[in-house]
């Protein structure tokens, strides 16, 4: 599928999904910094994508769901809240397969789009080229400043 195909499919997925989120993948997300954190950081303003309610510090919480990446590869991924010790953050881990790695260092700076179809099933898209990103944002009438949170769509 060409880049326009992926972009259109990602937009269609957002419009049909229950909840959607997008963010630019950071060097920390992709492991390029060599830090100890694992997986994709999910900001607190987007917790409704992966958990029904936010958690309070004191314990870790997790759940598993399938993510279908780029309309092809499926991973059983872990959504986790780290609430012990000094940590207080949400992440998505276990999202790498033999066929697709959204956390490849070459995806640093790419636009990640994650769409909840239902609580146990998600679509994931990694738009890695400027034209794909600009087309995606334009099709959903989003400003780059709106990236990093839940995508509001009209019914």
Question: Where do the model's predicted regions map?
Answer:
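Intrinsically disordered, charged low-complexity linkers and terminal tails
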Residues: 1-155
């Amino acid at each position: 599928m060409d880049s326009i195909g992926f972009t259109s499919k990602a937009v269609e997925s957002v419009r049909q999904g229950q909840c959607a989120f997008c963010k630019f993948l950071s060097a920390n997300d992709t492991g390029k910094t060599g830090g100890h954190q694992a997986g994709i950081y999910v900001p607190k303003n987007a917790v409704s994508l992966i958990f029904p309610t936010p958690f309070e510090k004191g314990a870790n919480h997790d759940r598993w769901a399938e993510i279908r990446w780029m309309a092809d590869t499926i991973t059983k991924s872990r959504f986790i809240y780290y609430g012990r010790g000094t940590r207080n953050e949400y992440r998505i881990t276990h999202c790498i397969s033999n066929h697709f790695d959204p956390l490849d260092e070459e995806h640093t700076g790419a636009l990640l789009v994650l769409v909840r179809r239902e609580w146990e099933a998600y679509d994931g898209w990694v738009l890695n080229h400027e034209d794909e990103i600009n087309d995606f944002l334009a099709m959903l009438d989003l400003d780059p400043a709106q990236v990093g949170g839940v995508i509001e769509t009209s019914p």
